[in-house]
Amino acid sequence: MDSPSSENPSSGNSPPSNPPHLTGSKLSHRPASRRQDSESNTRSAPIPDDEHGADLPLTMSASVVLSSLPRDAHRALADAEAVDTGKVTVRFQPLPSAPILKNRVFKISASQKFETVVKFLRKKLDCKDTDSVFCYVNSVFAPGLDEGVGGLWRCFKVDDQLIVSYSMTPAFG
């Protein structure tokens, strides 16, 4: 009643294993590949592991340092700096129940932070220190005060203007 498969239940699905002396390979720290087809003959041999310990890491002074930027990186940085050196047009749009400005369109340096836009708007609206002003770009999101005006204008401009909607109470979730 005892068959070879009943002694080892997993042997029914696996190929028969040959003893190491019959396979022609010696045991090593890596298991032998079980796939022996034409693909394995065309593949290159694996890179052997080094037998010595790990090398000491290089210090920062010994690492490679570029003496100058590549041309394309230098050109990209120059283009990015050129955008933030000009002026940007900002259009203020009041949301419901917000006071309306007489002049809604202003120019500001692209290198300024959005904080400058909010301070300028508070000054134009004659806000007290305790009054709140909520600003939204394109009536969609409230940018952080440390966001660059040039970057906001580049990404979210409409007709070459940065549309800033404002309200005295929170307008959006």
Curated annotation (Swiss-Prot):
- Biased-composition ranges, Low complexity, are 1-15
Got a GO cellular component term for this one?
phagophore assembly site membrane
Q: Where in the cell is it found?
A: Preautophagosomal structure membrane
One example GO MF annotation: Atg8-family ligase activity
Stored Pfam families: APG12
Q: Which CDD domains match?
A: Ubl_ATG12
Q: What is the protein name for this chain?
A: Ubiquitin-like protein ATG12
Tell whether Signal is among the UniProt keywords. Answer: no
Superkingdom of this protein's organism = Eukaryota
Output the SUPFAM superfamilies linked to this UniProt entry: Ubiquitin-like
